[in-house]
């Protein structure tokens, strides 16, 4: 989907080794196209395989300068959270250019949805220090890109530029001590599985239907 492609593009922008690997893959694709018999159609790119190959590379920390953008396309280049600001990857700055409206959810979680396509629920999530998301599973796939701070769940700890994929086989409870800003994309609603949080499942379903019913 477009939403998941945006998340992957933002990850590549933040990760130096992934940018290099992506460039190598693009170069190979061009060479293959030039060498191929023009009469034979090219196979569709293996997005899942490419995603696995890119995100499996070791991540390096570096600073990059963004190219100047047109004045006709105002971008939300930063998000201000508490006492500091977070610079957004260019592709997310474009996604946020329509404006972000933050809503407080239970447990110190703040959410601002952005409309990218009509197949996925795309949102910025800010977890305040010491907060946690209720235990939940996924009815489909969820990709999460950490933009600032970090969080942990049953599978590990994640920091800036980390790119996670969860699916219906996974159940977890993200939590953070330091606070964390993420960009998340879901292709189906998440389902809380314990305690009073289960009462919010109808709301999750409604939010997903509303997010995917927008017209472009």
Language model features with spans:
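Positively biased amphipathic helices and basic secretion/translocation or surface-docking motifs
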Residues: 2-4, 13-16, 20, 27-94
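Alpha-helical membrane-targeting segments
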Residues: 10, 103, 189-216
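Residue-level marker of beta-strand positions
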Residues: 17, 132, 162-163
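A short glycine-rich, His/Asp/Glu-containing loop-to-beta-strand
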Residues: 99-131
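Glycine- and acidic-residue-biased ligand/ion/polar-headgroup-sensing regions
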Residues: 128-131, 137-153
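Short acidic-glycine-tyrosine-enriched beta hairpin
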Residues: 153-176
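Ligand-binding loop in jelly-roll beta-barrel domains
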Residues: 170-192
